[in-house]
């Protein structure tokens, strides 16, 4: 779920503020998404959106509401003991996105952009 995802980002990027920083970034970070990603970070969000879309094809899986178990160790997120396919899948979506975010530069000019750029 989004609370776990936010915590995973804080694990890979200590001191970050995931909700304000990433909820309205580029064309894909935040709700929805379209067009061409504006940079590497936005591409991370596009891939994460697709991963959640793939998770929704698992019967009964609702990624935004799915609770899972994970652990943060040395800026790495580790998915732990998630007994259902949905939980394991969603945890991995969030884990991979958090790692991607940690590698991608944050460009303030791509925060709260005019969405006409995303067509």
UniProtKB/Swiss-Prot annotation:
Question: What GO CC annotations are associated with the protein?
Answer: extracellular region
Q: Which residues are glycosylated?
A: 82
Q: Would you say which domain of life the source belongs to?
A: Eukaryota
UniProt note on tissues of expression: Expressed by the venom gland.
**Keyword annotations of the record:** Calcium, Disulfide bond, Glycoprotein, Hydrolase, Lipid degradation, Lipid metabolism, Metal-binding, Secreted
- Xref: InterPro entries: PLipase_A2, PLipase_A2_Asp_AS, PLipase_A2_dom, PLipase_A2_dom_sf, PLipase_A2_His_AS
Essential cofactor(s): Ca(2+)
One GO MF term attached to the UniProt entry: signaling receptor binding
Gene Ontology biological process = arachidonate secretion; fatty acid biosynthetic process; lipid catabolic process; phospholipid metabolic process; positive regulation of fibroblast proliferation
Catalytic reaction annotation: a 1,2-diacyl-sn-glycero-3-phosphocholine + H2O = a 1-acyl-sn-glycero-3-phosphocholine + a fatty acid + H(+)
Q: Which residues bind Ca(2+)?
A: 28, 30, 32, 49
Q: Where is the active site?
A: 48, 94
Q: List the disulfide bonds.
A: 11-72, 27-118, 29-45, 44-100, 51-93, 61-86, 79-91
Compartment annotation = Secreted
Under the heading PANTHER family, the entry gives: PHOSPHOLIPASE A2, PHOSPHOLIPASE A2 FAMILY MEMBER
Its biological purpose is as follows: Snake venom phospholipase A2 (PLA2) that shows weak myotoxicity and induces edema in mice. Shows no cytotoxicity in vitro. Has an anticoagulant effect in vitro. PLA2 catalyzes the calcium-dependent hydrolysis of the 2-acyl groups in 3-sn-phosphoglycerides.
The family line of this record is: Belongs to the phospholipase A2 family. Group I subfamily. D49 sub-subfamily.
> What's this protein's name?
Basic phospholipase A2
Q: Which organism is it from?
A: Micrurus mipartitus (Red-tailed coral snake)
């Amino acid at each position: 779920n989004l609370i776990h995802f936010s915590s995973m980002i804080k694990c890979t990027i200590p001191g970050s503020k995931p909700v304000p920083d990433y909820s309205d970034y580029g064309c894909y970070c935040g709700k929805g998404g379209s067009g061409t990603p504006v940079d590497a970070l936005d591409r991370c969000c596009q891939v994460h959106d697709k991963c959640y879309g793939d998770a929704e094809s698992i019967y009964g899986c609702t990624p935004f509401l799915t609770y899972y178990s994970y652990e943060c160790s040395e800026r790495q997120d580790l998915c732990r003991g998630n007994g259902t396919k949905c939980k394991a899948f969603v945890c991995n979506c969030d884990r991979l996105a958090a790692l991607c975010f940690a590698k991608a530069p944050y460009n303030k000019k791509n925060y709260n952009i005019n969405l006409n750029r995303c067509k």
